[in-house]
Curated annotation (Swiss-Prot):
This is Glutamate-1-semialdehyde 2,1-aminomutase. Its EC number is 5.4.3.8. It comes from Corynebacterium urealyticum (strain ATCC 43042 / DSM 7109). One of its GO terms (cellular component) is cytoplasm. PANTHER family: GLUTAMATE-1-SEMIALDEHYDE 2,1-AMINOMUTASE, GLUTAMATE-1-SEMIALDEHYDE 2,1-AMINOMUTASE 1, CHLOROPLASTIC-RELATED.
């Protein structure tokens, strides 16, 4: 099917004819042809490449084209693709069985690694970031005996009913305020305020006195574009939230699904030192397989069944193959790896800035550690409203020129760019060359 998006030219469509055919087949059996909406290229147009293999920093598609990967499976692949040590750990574990329905030492090893690197005292392993945040919210409600959750506009915590209200990520990409199917009752238990607006947080607690179980926040947002939770003067928004939550008998849930073990050895906790009462993890902790975790203070975690009254379970939770992948990924994620990630992010940002400046394109690089996004407006965006108010119309043209020149960037202006340690000098040279037409396209784009 030919695209009607003006950012996708006919020559590019022809180069992707095998991927286009694969997408047509996918649409016969899968809604929209994808199993997660952001993969559908809804905000940029065109058809996503169908990936057949990946190695190091490179993706290969059904048309035989290769791409420098700056999506990294939306975060997990900090070491690049098919890292031999991770692949060997998966193969070795799989050869001894795929799932047992009984405890294994691997899940204890991964839990111990998480505890040793972060503020949490006990961990429960689950299968996805959504499951982690859903379970953390249930536990917070069970522990406090309260029903309401305070979240921030533009922050995304998975597709949990109550947390999809005014969410970011794919919800922002498709311009949805929430989602049909979410009941009024679920929405009524969610209090939403603008991000980094501490007075709005105080007001919300005053208006819902004794009802809010927890504040949930991304450690630093990456689903409305990248927004730092540490202000220009060094103030930690998370520290302010924790103080207010505790003063009102509520908990602080820090969502580190995206930031955990990506922005540093200790995740975002290593950046601001703010320990959530509960913390969620995903992406990097899985090594690329379906796994996630949540943890926190021992007295709270011990409210979980079988030792406490709050029920949470999963047939494949703690799956040995996923545990082996996650553990191998974390073992490789030492301080040298994070220095490389930081240097790679810095180098990419420098190239983007240089290219856009050359074409006089107004922009600001939104950065939080090794995560960043491009905001097509002057100055820092600090909340969802400011991020949406930028010249977002410039991004599709920018994106497609990058894609046509072998760079796989996030297919939405509201998503974070991710780097890996596998990037090479040749990759940076390819990126620099691709930025020349991409910056020109961004400059020429019209609303």
């Amino acid at each position: 099917m030919a695209s009607t998006n003006t950012n996708v030219n006919a020559a590019a469509e022809e180069r992707h004819h095998e991927s286009a055919a694969a997408m047509e087949r996918a649409r016969r059996f899968i809604p929209g042809g994808v199993n997660s909406p952001v993969r559908a290229f809804g905000s940029v147009g065109g058809t996503s490449p169908f990936i057949t293999s990946a190695s190091g920093s490179q993706l290969q598609d059904a048309d035989g084209l290769s791409y420098v990967d700056l999506v990294c499976s939306w975060g997990p692949m900090i070491h690049g693709h098919a890292h031999p040590e991770i692949v060997e750990a998966v193969k070795s574990t799989a050869s001894r069985g795929l799932s047992f329905g009984a405890p294994t030492s691997l899940e204890v090893d991964l839990a111990e690694e998480i505890v040793n690197r972060t503020s949490v005292e006990k961990v429960r392993l689950v299968n996805s970031g959504t499951e982690a945040t859903m379970s953390a919210v249930r536990l917070a409600r069970g522990f406090t005996g309260r029903d309401k959750i305070l979240k921030f506009e533009g922050c995304y915590h998975g597709h949990v009913d109550s947390l999809l209200v005014a969410a970011g990520s794919g919800v922002a990409t498709f311009g949805l305020p929430d989602s049909p199917g979410i009941t009024k009752a679920a929405a009524s238990d969610t209090v939403v305020v603008p991000y980094r607006d501490i007075e709005a947080v105080k007001k919300a607690f005053a208006e819902n006195e004794g009802q809010i179980a927890a504040i949930i926040t991304e450690a630093t947002p990456g689903n409305m574009g990248t927004v730092s939770s540490i202000t220009a003067d060094g103030t930690s928004f998370n520290a302010q939230l924790k103080e207010i939550a505790h003063a009102n008998g509520a908990l602080l849930i820090v969502d580190e699904v995206m930031t955990g073990f990506r922005v540093g050895y200790q995740g975002w906790f290593g950046k601001d030192g703010v320990a959530g009462d509960l913390t969620t993890f995903g992406k990097v902790v899985s090594g690329g397989l379906p796994a996630a975790a949540f943890g926190g203070r021992a007295d709270i975690m011990d409210h979980l069944a079988p030792v406490g009254p709050v029920y949470q379970a999963g047939t494949l939770s703690g799956n040995p193959v996923a545990m082996a992948s996650g553990l191998a990924s974390l073992k490789l994620a030492d301080e040298d790896a994070y220095r490389t990630l930081d240097a790679n992010a810095e180098r990419l940002i420098g190239l983007i800035t240089e290219a856009l400046n050359r074409e006089s394109v107004e922009h600001h690089i939104q950065r939080a550690g090794t995560m960043f996004s491009v905001r097509f407006a002057d100055g820092e965006g600090t909340n969802f409203g400011e991020m949406k108010a930028a010249d977002t119309f410039r991004y599709p043209a920018f994106f497609h020129e990058l894609l046509d020149n072998g760079i796989f960037a996030p297919p939405s202006v509201f998503e974070t760019w991710f780097v890996s340690t596998a990037l090479t000098d040749a990759d940076f040279e390819r990126f620099e060359a691709a930025l020349v037409p991409a910056a020109k396209a961004a400059a020429a784009a019209e609303a």
